[in-house]
Structures are given as C-alpha cells and as structure tokens.
C-alpha cells in the first residue's frame, strides 16, 4: 500500500488549484493536434468533485447557445495549464446535479460567497 502512495505523491502536479463546488472557474488546457499545440479555455460552474486519489476529477457545466455543456477534467492532468477562479459560489451541497434541471438565467445562478480581507491600520 505504501508503494501506491509513493507513486501518487510523485505524480501529483496541480495541487495549487484551490476552488470548491459552486465556484465559477476558467480552465485553460492544451490541445495537441498532430504537431500543433494550442491553448483552449472552458468557463463554467464546478458542479462536482470525484475524489479518487490521483484520479481526482472535477465536473464543470456551462450553457452554450441554450444547451448545457459539461466537461470532466482530471485535477492532476498535465494538459491543464491553469485554473482561474472568476467567482466564489456559496452553496450547501457537495454535488450540484440539480443545476441540470434549471432553465434560462436560473441555470447559472448561484449566490456569491464574500471573502473578508484583513486590513492593518
């Protein structure tokens, strides 16, 4: 069992991504087409995490031309360049699968979580 943990520790790359379910994020990832390599972004709400050790993934949902699009990203994948948190969401669930049933503006509506910054006087 210790051998598995050693291999997982070596392969963990993107530990710096700090975001939660309900946050609106932009994931910038590499697409390799033959000899060409380009960056593409996907922006949406994080609706779930699947915690499976090194196979940890997160699911992002967005509405594109009135159609819901979901994409699963592995957290420790080398194709992910960066994850930008655009907005912090305030939710009371670990999985936001109920967002799939919402229509129109309600499909992307989540309360914003306010962060308090300490200021020195």
UniProtKB/Swiss-Prot annotation:
The keyword Ribonucleoprotein applies. Pfam families: Ribosomal_L19 (PF01245). GO terms for biological process: translation. SUPFAM superfamilies: Translation proteins SH3-like domain (SSF50104). One of its GO terms (molecular function) is structural constituent of ribosome. Transmembrane segments: none annotated. Keywords: Ribonucleoprotein, Ribosomal protein. Belongs to the bacterial ribosomal protein bL19 family. This is Large ribosomal subunit protein bL19. It comes from Borreliella burgdorferi (strain ATCC 35210 / DSM 4680 / CIP 102532 / B31) (Borrelia burgdorferi). The lineage of its organism: Bacteria, Pseudomonadati, Spirochaetota, Spirochaetia, Spirochaetales.
